[in-house]
UniProtKB/Swiss-Prot annotation:
Pathway: Lipid metabolism; fatty acid biosynthesis. Its EC number is 2.3.1.-. InterPro entries: ELO_CS, ELO_fam. It comes from Trypanosoma brucei brucei (strain 927/4 GUTat10.1). This is Fatty acid elongase 3. The keyword Transmembrane helix applies. The keyword NAD does not apply. It is an enzyme of class 2 (transferase). It is found in: Endoplasmic reticulum membrane.
Amino acid sequence: MLMNFGGSYDAYINNFQGTFLAEWMLDHPSVPYIAGVMYLILVLYVPKSIMASQPPLNLRAANIVWNLFLTLFSMCGAYYTVPYLVKAFMNPEIVMAASGIKLDANTSPIITHSGFYTTTCALADSFYFNGDVGFWVALFALSKIPEMIDTAFLVFQKKPVIFLHWYHHLTVMLFCWFAYVQKISSGLWFASMNYSVHSIMYLYYFVCACGHRRLVRPFAPIITFVQIFQMVVGTIVVCYTYTVKHVLGRSCTVTDFSLHTGLVMYVSYLLLFSQLFYRSYLSPRDKASIPHVAAEIKKKE
């Protein structure tokens, strides 16, 4: 049975066509908005109304299962996307040949013939949108809606939901939905980074949920630092693609929507995470009042 499942799974993801999913998402733009409204109700209304007079629910078992699932899910996503990103980065000629992009012979090779250019600007459906990598990039875009269940655990256990937590969940969910529909080339960077960071982050949450918080607590600032580094790289990717497309006027498969919203998101995340890191681990005044909150928040990329 396992062999049959494995064979069916391999056959499905190897023949996956992201275009069909993108068309469905394009035809259903109300889905992320409805999810967003319901999420805001969960964050802003439920704690002050439904849960105000209720005791916190004991969701430890469910929380353990949930974090274990997201850990394994993120590891699988990283397993498929990260090696492919590295391969495309180290062998840009393969991506350029498949993309069909015609380059000006006088253009600096540092700008438009490098691995960074090919992995951020030279989209080829056969590389990023279809097949096994395309399948996990698609799951990345879709997973941002169910990942908001993170917040439900906090709300129904009557734990605080800080602004960074729900702001990040909400904006990433909306961005991923519409950026996927627009087939932005830099999406592989975002998916690879997010899967990688989440593999570590949800593993931390899983161990904490199992009752071993003290064991992994020293890793909390490291996790937050890695998240900050993710935001730095994301900001660099967005700024680079903007420069290539609008300053140099070269071909780059990104949209103005993804450039503008991506820049606002990554810069705001960078500022908020940096502030959180400082208040949690560097500021003597706030260390006691915000104990290890940086790695406790259910956030992400």
